[in-house]
Amino acid sequence: MDTILALKVIIMGIVEGLTEFLPISSTGHLILAGSLLEFTGPKVKVFEIAIQTGAMLAVVWEYRVKIAAVLGGLFTERRAQKFAVNIVVAFLPAALLGLVFAGAIKEKLFAPVPVAIAFIVGGFVILWVERRNKQQVHAERVQSVDEMTLLDAFKVGCAQAFALIPGTSRSGASIIGGMMFGLSRKAATEFSFFLAIPTLMGATVYSVYKDRALLSMADIPLFGLGGLAAFFSAFLCVRWLLRYISTHDFTFFAYYRIGFGLFVLLSAHYGWVVWAE
């Protein structure tokens, strides 16, 4: 691996880690970053999905005590069983739809312009949900992930399925969806973190297996370096986001999405930036 390639891999890993758990779309930012860096192609699309494992492991480490308690109580504690079932139920909608539409989505929508449109639409959805929740005094029905019902989990899972569209944001769809359905900001954010574990792992395993013919043993250092960069940047981001949501809403991210999406569309139209496909 030459120095330039290593730098590109590290940058992509950092972008993944910083954006995976914010409601701004990691996939969208990876597509745009890869386009700017001229780091594109079929193998890179697998790389972009695989390095999500690094970000996922950051959540595992941050919530290792909770995860260990759930795993330890799977066969003995009703609370742990309920939580595990909720995660599985929330995971299924995106997993099933992903199996059906992943190929078409990767072929048609993994490009800067569709991503920019999804950025803008998602930004307006966040603004609408934040305004709606402020107007409804009793909007927050669920204060903790342990209070969620099976129906709550299924609704969040259906919301997460919209994130199959690049630029939508997996965390944004699940968090904002959770808030729409009565979860507090903290409960929605934490459930989104936990839901990321099977979702990102499943996406990685599926993508690597499906496109295994494109890969070789020589790619392991590249994937490992990107995953490591994603782990450390995601760990810092998760810690920061948990502090941020205690005193802020997601309005800033909505305006960021809209502004950045408009910039990408205008730059593509007027040729300010050459976005590689």
UniProtKB/Swiss-Prot annotation:
E.C. number(s) listed in UniProt: 3.6.1.27
Domain of life: Bacteria
Remaining remarks: Bacitracin is thought to be involved in the inhibition of peptidoglycan synthesis by sequestering undecaprenyl diphosphate, thereby reducing the pool of lipid carrier available.
Lineage: Bacteria, Pseudomonadati, Pseudomonadota, Betaproteobacteria, Burkholderiales
Family statement: Belongs to the UppP family.
InterPro entries: UppP (IPR003824)
Function of the protein: Catalyzes the dephosphorylation of undecaprenyl diphosphate (UPP). Confers resistance to bacitracin.
Any single GO CC term annotated in Swiss-Prot or TrEMBL for this entry: plasma membrane
Entry protein name: Undecaprenyl-diphosphatase
Gene source species: Herminiimonas arsenicoxydans
GO aspect biological process, one term: regulation of cell shape
Topological type in the membrane: Multi-pass membrane protein
Localization of this protein: Cell inner membrane
Matching NCBIfam families: PRK00281.1-2, PRK00281.1-4, undec_PP_bacA
GO MF assignments: undecaprenyl-diphosphatase activity
UniProt keyword annotations, A-Z: Antibiotic resistance, Cell inner membrane, Cell membrane, Cell shape, Cell wall biogenesis/degradation, Hydrolase, Membrane, Peptidoglycan synthesis, Transmembrane, Transmembrane helix
Catalytic activity: di-trans,octa-cis-undecaprenyl diphosphate + H2O = di-trans,octa-cis-undecaprenyl phosphate + phosphate + H(+)
